[in-house]
Amino acid sequence: MDSVASEDVAVNFTLEEWALLDPSQKKLYRDVMRETFRNLACVGKKWEDQSIEDWYKNQGRILRNHMEEGLSESKEYDQCGEAFSQILNLNLNKKIPTIVRPCECSLCGKVFMHHSSLSRHIRSHLGHKPYDYQEYGEKPYKCKQCGKAFSSCQSFRRHERTHTGEKPYACPECGKAFISLPSVRRHMIKHTGDGPYKCQECGKAFDRPSLFQIHERTHTGEKPYECQECAKAFISLPSFQRHMIRHTGDGPYKCQECGKAFDRPSLFRIHERTHTGEKPHECKQCGKAFISFTNFQSHMIRHTGDGPYKCKVCGRAFIFPSYVRKHERTHTGEKPYECNKCGKTFSSSSNVRTHERTHTGEKPYECKECGKAFISLPSVRRHMIKHTGDGPYKCQVCGRAFDCPSSFQIHERTHTGEKPYECQVCGKAFISLKRIRKHMILHTGDGPYKCQVCGKAFDCPSSVRTHERTHTGEKPYECKECGKAFNYASSIRIHERTHTGEKPYECKQCGKTFSYSSSFQRHERAHNGDKPYVKNVGKLSFITQPSNTCENE
């Protein structure tokens, strides 16, 4: 089968023919040619979208060359005036002046619209072919960093900036920097709202129909690209391709810490910050810092309340429509993502992915201080506070720090003895809702995870694994000082205080300190004149002191 070249499928118009087309026909021509080029790409022709656009612009330049010839032969400008304005309707290069002065090749007489086009043409006489509009397979400019090839020097230089981080084009409105002039122009539409394609839902404007079409899907919920591996769907082909890297691991940018791969250096750099802790985007109002500009923008909306997408229930603003849809599920209770293992449902895909690691045992996030591994990044960040003590919520009794107020509030109850959650079956009380839910499984026997030895049920796989150690006798936590081994990480932490002498619990009334929260609580009750624990057995009532062996529970 003969190879197919772009000129074999291209439809070229003369000046007179083009002038007879109405705007809708011209638009149809553009759409058909773009689709034709993409079909060629599917059967073996490979080129960048930029090359398609360059070829298309070249067709416009050919038409303009015809126009120039018509102008040079005609004494009356108005004979070609209407055709001229219609050709400019192509919007291929808005900066082309009304009177174009063509550049002529001195070797063959061929005429070009730009000096750069003439320079490329002259190289063809000299035997150099750095770029040829007719040979789309040729990409002589290869990136040394990632191996990606380009057909034009301009595209290659623009790509190199993704590696160097150079962003020479800054937005005069907000200061955000970009690697190319087209990028900053597209960004400026956010400020001016002057794009030719405007969303009827939110008013956001775009300079290209493809971007506008993708954006519309954020409102309609349409996701035409579905992953055959996990059935997750996406609104755009680039999003789908980035997702596939998770399955194949074939991205050109691979993290040395965790092995995760990425298709773009910008995403790779942001990911690296999750390991280094770097947060270059800082909020001037509250001092909170972020690893990415997108996260920073989302945060700023909390201060300004000025996001483009607002929750219809509570009015909270968001930067993306996907964020507001996710948030609205907190009001509706909708949980569309289901775990294939246990049937548990979640409101977001990220939450179900994190949950699935409790089944697989995967813990990709490791603490650099002690080596402990975690299933999610927030988990390892919360854990790091134990080492750094830098959490925003600090306990006044023992000095322990926390990253969120709910965790801090639960911890405070270990000092005050408050247990607001009481079991209606046996009367036992708990400091948190999570603990009473775990306890209720003892009564109902209805937990999703059951011990294979005794049938006891649990609410999460980590709990059943810990319980199974009571049958196997496994004690994976060993004290480095004395060699004593323990079933639980919490048990060894409490035991280590016998070596260090640490007593984190201090009585505010007399200053006495304690190693264990249970000892501290008993002491506080002595000040208050409260009796420790009263148990009723039939008609008998008696006081009991909890055994030290249970202090870690």
Swiss-Prot record:
Metal-binding recorded as keyword: yes
Signal peptide: none
GO cellular component, one term: nucleus
Zn-finger (C2H2-type) residues: 103-125, 141-163, 169-191, 197-219, 225-247, 253-275, 281-303, 309-331, 337-359, 365-387, 393-415, 421-443, 449-471, 477-499, 505-527
Annotated PROSITE patterns: KRAB, ZINC_FINGER_C2H2_1, ZINC_FINGER_C2H2_2
Cross-link (Glycyl lysine isopeptide (Lys-Gly) (interchain with G-Cter in SUMO2)): K438
BP GO annotations: regulation of transcription by RNA polymerase II
Domain of life (superkingdom): Eukaryota
Pfam families: KRAB, zf-C2H2, zf-C2H2_6, zf-H2C2_2
Keywords: DNA-binding, Isopeptide bond, Metal-binding, Nucleus, Repeat, Transcription, Transcription regulation, Ubl conjugation, Zinc, Zinc-finger
Record-level Gene Ontology MF annotations: DNA-binding transcription factor activity; RNA polymerase II cis-regulatory region sequence-specific DNA binding; zinc ion binding
SMART domains to which the protein is assigned, alphabetical: KRAB, ZnF_C2H2
Matching InterPro entries: KRAB (IPR001909), KRAB_dom_sf (IPR036051), Znf_C2H2_sf (IPR036236), Znf_C2H2_type (IPR013087)
Keyword Transcription regulation: yes
Entry-linked Gene3D superfamilies: 6.10.140.140, Classic Zinc Finger
Subcellular location per the Swiss-Prot or TrEMBL entry: Nucleus
KRAB domain location: 4-83
Predominant place of localization: nucleus
Family: Belongs to the krueppel C2H2-type zinc-finger protein family.
Record function comment: May be involved in transcriptional regulation.
Protein name as annotated: Zinc finger protein 564
Organism from which the protein derives: Homo sapiens (Human)
